[in-house]
């Protein structure tokens, strides 16, 4: 072969087919450069900051809601307490007046206990009786009632023992044997305890 033919042979590819081995496809993995990593970190920082702020705001909201609910409950309790106090004020309205009138009633009872010696004293006693009855009915109309004491078992919540005596005859111990001063209720409240003598 001449030099020329050799050169042509080298330039022509051989007709033998060479099978190329297929390459396995690998999944695409982006390769980040240093600048891109910094940008991603910088982008995540505001998101994390926003999440922190959101969590903080949620805590504040929860605390404010709790405070609001507690305040509402407290207001409701105050309203109920005020209603109860107003109801008691209306129920026991006139308590101080009734207390002030009781000594007058006591004096009228003492006047009625005195003996009338002549006609003028008897007519005066009738006038005192009418005044006493009228005053007692007026007090009863406003819820003032006499405390039953004579012969009753001693009760320290409604009786005030001023003296004790020995049990005599058929008397029972801890029984009221004498009333020095009548006691009164105003509705269901003790206005004045009865002053009594108790057998022991």
UniProtKB/Swiss-Prot annotation:
CC annotations in GO: cytoplasm
InterPro entries, sorted: GrpE, GrpE_coiled_coil, GrpE_head
Pfam families given in the database record: GrpE
Renumbered residue ranges of the record's region Disordered: 1-50
SUPFAM superfamilies: Coiled-coil domain of nucleotide exchange factor GrpE, Head domain of nucleotide exchange factor GrpE
Keyword Cytoplasm among record annotations: yes
Gene3D superfamilies in the record: 3.90.20.20, Head domain of nucleotide exchange factor GrpE (2.30.22.10)
Acidic residues: compositionally biased ranges: 32-41
Ranges of biased composition (kind: Basic and acidic residues): 1-27
An example molecular function term from Gene Ontology annotations: protein homodimerization activity
Disulfide pairings: none
UniProt keyword list: Chaperone, Cytoplasm, Stress response
Record-level GO BP terms: protein folding
CDD domains per the UniProt record, alphabetical: GrpE (cd00446)
HAMAP family referenced in this protein's UniProt entry, alphabetically: GrpE (MF_01151)
Quaternary state and interactors: Homodimer.
Name under which the protein is recorded: Protein GrpE
